[in-house]
Amino acid sequence: MATFTVIKMTHFSPLHIGTGKENYDFSASDLHSDTLLSALAAMRVQMGQTENLESFLSSFLLSSAFPFYENRYFLPKMQGKIKIVVKGKAESEYRKSLKKIHYIESELWQKLSRGETLELETIQQIQGDLLLKKEDGISVCKSQVSERVSVSRASEDAEPFFFDWKFFDRKAGLYCLTDAKGELLDEIIQLFILLGETGLGTDKNIGGGKFY
């Protein structure tokens, strides 16, 4: 059976993940593996290791980044309808809440992946886009939209726009999985350390997306 190492990214400064569009009023909820791999490749080049870049990137697997809270890990909701009921509630009372779920706590995810039906004790186990194994109101991150101004170099006209930052709880962050072992794993961890100092996402030049 394949084994994977968990790499945690903690103590994030405010983070904005681009959506591939020009608007900044919404930060993407997913940090995909190809984005992480590109960032690690950039760190490797920054360290002067420009040779064999393709062979390096193809020598290991790296997952997308998913949220965690302390030692509680979340995985993305699987495609298709998931079997979830809420004790004492009609489906019409919680259908909208189910549609908001984006990440599922790992123990519950494993049950759903086996085709089991989950019976929630309370609808409060759904917190925002998270499905929790117990009702304790944790929050991985909060979104804050602020107004900013862009000044064109050509016309010097000020154009306001909205920018969405994600603020992570101090006990929370993002994690990813890799199958790398030995010296290769050590190198990847060092690249993540450098990446944390540089930052992820948008506005790294003003301290955005830094982590430990």
Regions found by a protein language model. Name each.
Residues 1-212:
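Conserved active-site/ligand-binding neighborhood in enzyme cores
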